[in-house]
UniProtKB/Swiss-Prot annotation:
GO CC, any one term: ribosome
Protein's UniProt name: Large ribosomal subunit protein uL4
Keyword terms of this UniProt record: Ribonucleoprotein, Ribosomal protein, RNA-binding, rRNA-binding
GO molecular-function terms, A-Z: rRNA binding; structural constituent of ribosome
Gene: rplD
GO BP term, example: translation
Keyword Lyase: no
Biological function: One of the primary rRNA binding proteins, this protein initially binds near the 5'-end of the 23S rRNA. It is important during the early stages of 50S assembly. It makes multiple contacts with different domains of the 23S rRNA in the assembled 50S subunit and ribosome.
Family statement drawn from the similarity comment of this UniProt entry: Belongs to the universal ribosomal protein uL4 family.
Record-linked Gene3D superfamilies: 3.40.1370.10
Complex formation: Part of the 50S ribosomal subunit.
Amino acid sequence: MKLDVIKLDGGKAGSVDLDDAIFGIDEIRGDILQRVVTWQLAKRRSGNHKIQVRNEVSRTSKKMYKQKGTGGARHGSRRAAQFVGGAKAHGPVVRSHAFDLPKKIRALALRHALSSKAKAGSLVVVDSVALTEAKTAALRATFDKIGLKNALVIAGPEVDANFKLAARNIPNVDVLPNAGLNVYDVLRRQTLVLTKDAVEAISARFAEKEAA
């Protein structure tokens, strides 16, 4: 697959060959994308919600009244869940929501996510994102010129410092180095912007996985 390369100012900068095995998958597997997005979001959950159980409630554990002779129901501690101020039965506890997902599934999902952007015409390749100065207003005007309203920008191994500073206050624009490329962030933004360095790094990344 061949795609035109543009400059940040909208000018043409040649073209780049994209690997069809990464960017040219025809049948997008939504089920695999859903599995990986769920896996990513589950890992992010803090899991620190907590409720007091019986041994943690600050109430006496003394028996409420004698077992027999009152005509009432038999009760023990006031910490029991049926009493106001008592414990919570089977409440949430601190735990991890993360679960395992095979690396091959995660890699396949990333291929499908990248291919979905290319198939939808939402993939843009720029020659470079290096800026001479960190000016948010200037970068916003540049994005407006090339039609970027909601985008994920993937740079090479390192993100240009001026570009990172200029872009961080622009809403609906995320900037990540190549190592940060992931399925969730690709799908949550309308347009995927890759630098030429990022394209090369992505191809090398999948080549290493296939060789392993």
